[in-house]
């Protein structure tokens, strides 16, 4: 099985302050997220981490934490906080992918990057875009994308219960997009659905973001 996650931020104490993560200490967070990954991703599965595996940790300490994850095949699409995982001492931690990584799995094109894109390869032909970086929480961002016909999804752990998302779960999610629109208007929270409930949800989300 293939899995995706992003922005675990192992070792980053301040991430507890600017996200809604439910732990009191960074050690509790590290342990819980490792347990969440191991609870879903099997040893022989494949896991894509779309950036920011760790922050404020030495490469050696981050590598030691990586070894606690049972999955053997982990790909890292680099984010803005990642180490140089190609240096010899830690080169075995991940398969390091390019900043924009394009997969084709069972006919489905998937564009991976750390940063969200407004335009991605094949977006007019049903390709998915998976990303991280923005630390969206509670699923609101992903739901707004789906309601507006965008095949774009934040796989970051803050948006997904601090756990990876499987390819099958994403396939089911995107099946809920009735008519992919093939374009993005900036900013992403512009409501084009005509649905008043979506408008109320967007207004509430904007207020929340303004307060944070």
Region roles according to the model:
Residues 211-212:
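Intrinsically disordered, low-complexity, mixed-charge
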Residues 201:
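Extended, charge-rich helix/loop segments that form flexible
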Residues 91-198:
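Conserved beta-sheet core of the metallophosphoesterase superfamily
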Residues 3-5, 10-104:
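Core catalytic region of metal-dependent phosphoesterases/phosphodiesterases
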Residues 1-7, 152-155:
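Short, hydrophobic/glycine-enriched beta-strand segments
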């Amino acid at each position: 099985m293939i899995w995706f996650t992003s922005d675990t931020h192992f070792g980053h104490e301040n991430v507890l302050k600017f996200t809604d993560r439910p732990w009191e200490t960074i050690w509790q967070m590290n342990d819980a997220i490792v347990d969440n990954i191991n609870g879903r991703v099997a040893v022989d599965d494949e896991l894509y981490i779309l950036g920011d595996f760790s922050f404020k940790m030495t490469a050696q300490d981050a590598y030691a934490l990586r070894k606690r994850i049972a999955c053997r095949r982990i790909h890292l699409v680099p984010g803005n906080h990642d180490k140089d995982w190609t240096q010899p001492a830690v080169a075995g931690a991940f398969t390091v992918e390019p900043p924009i990584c394009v997969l084709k799995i069972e006919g489905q094109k998937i564009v991976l990057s750390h940063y969200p894109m407004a335009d991605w390869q094949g977006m007019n032909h049903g390709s998915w875009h998976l990303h991280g970086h923005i630390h969206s929480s509670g699923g609101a961002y992903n739901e707004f994308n789906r309601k507006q016909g965008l095949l774009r999804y934040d796989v970051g752990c803050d948006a997904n219960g601090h756990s990876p998302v499987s390819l099958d779960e994403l396939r089911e999610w995107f099946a809920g997009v009735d008519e992919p629109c093939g374009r993005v208007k900036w900013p992403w929270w512009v409501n084009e659905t005509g649905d008043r409930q979506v408008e109320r949800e967007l207004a509430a989300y904007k207020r929340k973001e303004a307060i944070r």
